[in-house]
Amino acid sequence: MTGRVEGKVAFITGAARGQGRSHAIRLAQEGADIIAVDICAQVDSVPYPMATPDDLAQTVKEVEALDRRIVAVQADVRDFGALKAALDKGVAQLGRLDIVSANAGIASYGPAGELAEQTWRDMIDINLTGDWHAAKAAIPHLIAGGRGGSIIITSSDAGLKAYQNAAHYVAAKHGVVGLMRTLALELAPHMIRVNSLHPTQVNTDMVMNEPTFRLFMPGTEHPTVEDFRPVSQALNALPIPWVEPVDISNALLFLASDEARYITGVTLPVDAGAAIK
């Protein structure tokens, strides 16, 4: 099947690499033009290197190689004004908006009683408030278009269950579910659907780094990806250690397409069965 989102425009936050880049490519493969946003800068409380302007440029290159249009802007999802300006610029150039992937997110770790105040605030501001900002900026365009639309928010298995040493992450990702369900109710009269995705570990830079490995192996001084592999696999029901970004992108494509035209308010795990363990 091809052209599943032909002629539509998708707004993706966190689009410079990882799941966001994968979403941009997968939607472009099926006919969508892309508005891509990423901070392309480091957040001090994040323990791994974040995306760069070169990463965002690579996303542009890969989308354009598919003969689709893309408008890419550096913006911080914590800054509503900047995010709205980025989206408005994209809509002005591409002419419409149909799909929103509120995907930007960070990870950091520590016992709840020991988290720094700024670490907590950064997590909530990016992983929860940032998703609200993306939706808030998009809603007027979706309503004005009169064609309905699809908002897909990236949560996590941590939005469905608890994990130790990640209270701020778990709180933000659970909060996303409440946001999604409320938006689904509010926007249903406009035929705008809102759903959330809940991945297990994904093979991206946000997961494949030593600080994340240490979360799952606190007794290992310098854990490697090979150390992490069996520990990660034990979290999933299916015998795999992690999923690939395209696995999440395929689920997002389904929710964005007319195949899911009556699906709204759903928490969709793409997690190799992690949520049922």
Predicted regions and their residues:
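A conserved structural motif in NAD(P)-dependent oxidoreductases
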Residues: 225, 236-248
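Canonical Rossmann dinucleotide-binding motif of NAD(H)/NADP(H)-dependent dehydrogenases/reductases
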Residues: 3-39
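Substrate-binding pocket helix/loop in short-chain dehydrogenase/reductase
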Residues: 63, 111-112, 116-124, 232
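Short, small/polar-rich loop/turn modules that mediate ligand/substrate recognition or access, typified
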Residues: 188, 193, 263-265
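Short C-terminal tail/terminal secondary-structure segment
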Residues: 161, 239-240, 252-253, 264-277
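Active-site helix of classical SDR
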Residues: 135, 172, 180
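Residue(s) in the substrate-gating loop at a strand-loop-helix junction
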Residues: 156
